[in-house]
Curated annotation (Swiss-Prot):
Gene3D superfamilies, A to Z: Hypothetical protein af1432 (1.10.3210.10)
Assigned protein family: Belongs to the dGTPase family. Type 2 subfamily.
PROSITE patterns attached to this UniProt entry: HD (PS51831)
Superkingdom of source: Bacteria
Family annotation (SMART domains): HDc
The keyword NAD appears for this protein: no
GO MF, any single term: triphosphoric monoester hydrolase activity
The keyword 4Fe-4S appears for this protein: no
Source organism of this protein record: Wolinella succinogenes (strain ATCC 29543 / DSM 1740 / CCUG 13145 / JCM 31913 / LMG 7466 / NCTC 11488 / FDC 602W) (Vibrio succinogenes)
Keywords: Hydrolase
Name of the featured protein: Deoxyguanosinetriphosphate triphosphohydrolase-like protein
Domain HD, chain residue ranges per copy: 52-187
Length: 365
């Protein structure tokens, strides 16, 4: 298939193909539910914390800026970025890990993967047309959703779909840009959220070269650490610095300007896009610090422990009592749908708040 083509013919309008993709994503119910899904901190913890929705918007802004600088297709990058987290479960990665464990326990060997679930949302679960499932997005956007993060999960697709989406090859350069924009956004903004709510201090991260350099830069701007604006200047400088580090390592990509595909580069070969070696080294150290200092903070662990328990209980409830499911999902099972797959789709679609309220309704009353 050509990048701009769709699996189902549909009347085109005045927009370009990737603008239509972006608009369909923004208007779908799964996108709206991202407002109440956890990034790192549970949504109920405070209205300041970033959610999957705000994160997706931030990723799309960074991805568009990078794509523009490299002469790539900005709108395709935006569409992939806005949809890249549609498949996330409630309670962040802890929820996804628990659903993965439960699916494997019930005989679904491939388990759960949020990238594939995002693909499943836009290609099957969203119901927008009378004659086919999904949002009918272009091939390039679907491929970017499926393959924006390496390694690619071949076990989720049949042989025909593996061949169509060429999982032995890298995706478009725009999809690779989104993967790195995602990394830039979550590292910077998780630090921001963590500091805001007292889970970490900048001093806890100063052994990171990146953090030290950005602290120095903010101080050189005449901002004192005691000032509220210091955190904003630090985060802004960190994002800019990471973007420049990516652009510095991606000059070769200019040779591919105007192309949507990545010239079918085998997945084991080096890409023309990526952080410079120095920036890659610094970022790796910072992420390691964040893992120990923030992502494994006791308050985060407690919330994630609750989230895993909530998903586990709901999954077992629905598997044991199918009549607890919405009628349309009961019908899917009665018509031959695999119960564990139907239940997983349902739970993955829930917001944090909905999952917590349903858990309380079934177990506390």
């Amino acid at each position: 298939m050509r990048p701009h083509e769709r699996f189902h013919d549909f009347l085109d309008d005045f927009r370009n193909p990737y603008s239509r993709d972006r608009d369909r994503i923004i208007h779908c119910s799964s996108f709206r539910r991202l407002e109440y899904k956890t990034q790192v901190f549970l949504n109920s913890s405070g209205d300041y914390f970033r959610t999957r929705l705000t994160h997706s918007i931030e990723v799309s802004q960074i991805a568009r800026s990078i794509a523009s600088h490299l002469g790539l297709n900005e709108t395709l990058a935006e569409a992939i970025a806005l949809s890249h987290d549609l498949g996330h479960t409630p309670f962040g990665h802890a929820g996804g890990d628990e659903l993965d464990r439960l699916l494997k326990k019930h005989g679904f060997e491939a388990g759960f993967d949020h990238n594939f679930q995002s693909f499943r949302v836009v290609s099957k679960l969203e119901k927008r047309y009378p004659n086919f499932e999904g949002l009918n997005l272009t091939f390039a956007t679907l491929e970017g959703i499926l393959k924006h993060s390496y390694p690619y999960q071949k076990s989720f697709l049949d042989a025909a779909m593996n061949e169509i989406f060429a999982l032995d090859y890298h995706p478009s350069l725009e999809a690779i840009v989104v993967d790195h924009a995602d990394e830039i956004a979550y590292v910077s903004h998780d630090i921001d959220d963590g500091i805001k709510y007292g889970l970490i201090r900048l001093e806890d991260l100063e052994e990171s070269e990146l953090v030290g350099e950005m602290i120095d830069k903010a101080e050189q701007e005449g901002v004192k650490r005691s000032e509220k604006v210091f955190r904003y200047r630090f985060v802004s400088n960190l994002i800019n610095h990471l973007v420049y580090g990516f652009l510095e390592g991606s000059q070769e990509a200019r040779l591919h300007q105007g192309e949507v595909r990545s010239a079918m580069i085998p997945s084991g070969e080096r890409l023309p896009l990526g952080f410079s070696p120095e920036m890659g080294r610094k970022l790796k150290k910072l992420k390691k610090l964040l893992f120990t200092k923030l992502y494994r903070h006791e308050q985060v662990n407690r919330k994630m422990f609750f989230g895993r328990g909530c998903i586990r209980a709901l999954f077992e409830d629905f598997m044991n009592e199918k009549n607890l499911l919405p009628k349309e999902l009961q019908e899917r099972i009665n018509q031959g749908g695999k119960a564990h797959r139907v239940v997983a789709d349902y739970i993955a679609s829930m917001s944090d708040r909905y999952a917590m309220n349903l858990y309380k309704e079934l177990h506390i009353g």
